[in-house]
Amino acid sequence: MNSEFMDALTTLEKEKGISKEVIIEAIEAALISGYKRNFNQAQNVRVDVNRENGSIRVFARKEVVEEVFDARLEISLDEAKGINPNYEVDDVVEIEVTPKDFGRIAAQTAKQVVTQRVREAERGIIYADFIDREEDIMTGIVQRQDNRFIYVDLGKVEALLPLSEQMPNESYRHNDRIKAYITKVEKTTKGPQIMISRTHPGLLKRLFELEVPEIYDGTVELKSVAREAGDRSKISVHAENPEVDPVGACVGPKGSRVQTIVNELKGEKIDIVRWSEDPVEYVANALSPSKVVKVNVNEEEKTTQVIVPDYQLSLAIGKRGQNARLAAKLTGWKIDIKSESEAQELGLLEDEAASHETLALDQETADQPEATVETSKNHEEE
């Protein structure tokens, strides 16, 4: 090692952000191991690397004692005072023992240490960068795929998109650019492992936060997301300011905002409904685009019984129960849907017991603004 090597470490520190001092200390520690392995395993030594010219010196560290039992680790008081009269018992004396051919070992060791530390530092920098991006969106480029993962280049690292996190309505080809949600960042022996998703509800949430300024600045709050990726999703939104239309803000002028998100999700249908702290109103809104006649609420069991017009029953339940299922996920309430005629037969339209809260929705509540966006067409259900 020489001054050029030390200059190289200085450059490395500037370009890679790897501390020069940390590398030198690692080299010194590695050289101690190298010395013991090649010259004297039992000796207690210290290796000193000159920070200016890169020269290396090895010192044996010996304890000052009255009587020497192990000359490799101890030195007599008389001999120590011959070096420096100020030494006393229990002091430590350092004696240079640098081997003549130690430079070759030092050069090999230094190269290995620097390579390892650069690799570790780069992995650490990448991990620190991506751990802050958990639960966020990044755009990557599809590289390849196997029967378990699609490998997506995120610039500094390759992320893994598991089969279970891939949308069923889209296929992926080499060099495709995709937006994905970072679900997990883990340290491994091979470096950071980044797991991403195209199906996570967080992807839809972040897309709205990025696309709708009112959500980004807090004017509109996205309260909940329920998603069956690639097919249909529901989100509930709320604004403290009564003059702000949270649904309209998310839809955007002529549906432009939500349509951008629909396009990104390859045509996934999105229902945008108004959130309410009143479970009766919230559940009714969540079942959009279906109309609701009445909602009976059981607070203790967190269940609701929803009555809809006969001609709206199929719409309320949805294909394979999807609309009701998403509404339940969105609100956190169990939902049992019955047609108006069935409810009449069961006497459910009569006054309920005091333990159940009921509300027959008036026309104003039933017409609470919601939006359903399917493909390139944005419309508001009446």
From Swiss-Prot:
Domain of life: Bacteria
Main subcellular location: cytoplasm
Pfam family, one: NusA_N
Keyword match Transcription regulation: yes
Keywords: Cytoplasm, RNA-binding, Transcription, Transcription antitermination, Transcription regulation, Transcription termination
A cellular component annotation (GO) from this entry: cytosol
Compartments reported by the entry: Cytoplasm
Residues covered by the KH domain: 301-367
The keyword rRNA processing is assigned to this record: no
SUPFAM superfamilies: Nucleic acid-binding proteins (SSF50249), Prokaryotic type KH domain (KH-domain type II) (SSF54814), Transcription factor NusA, N-terminal domain (SSF69705)
Domain S1 motif stretches: 135-199
Chain segments carrying region Disordered: 348-382
One of the record's GO molecular function terms: RNA binding
Quaternary assembly: Monomer. Binds directly to the core enzyme of the DNA-dependent RNA polymerase and to nascent RNA.
Task of the protein: Participates in both transcription termination and antitermination.
Protein name: Transcription termination/antitermination protein NusA
Source organism of the structure: Halalkalibacterium halodurans (strain ATCC BAA-125 / DSM 18197 / FERM 7344 / JCM 9153 / C-125) (Bacillus halodurans)
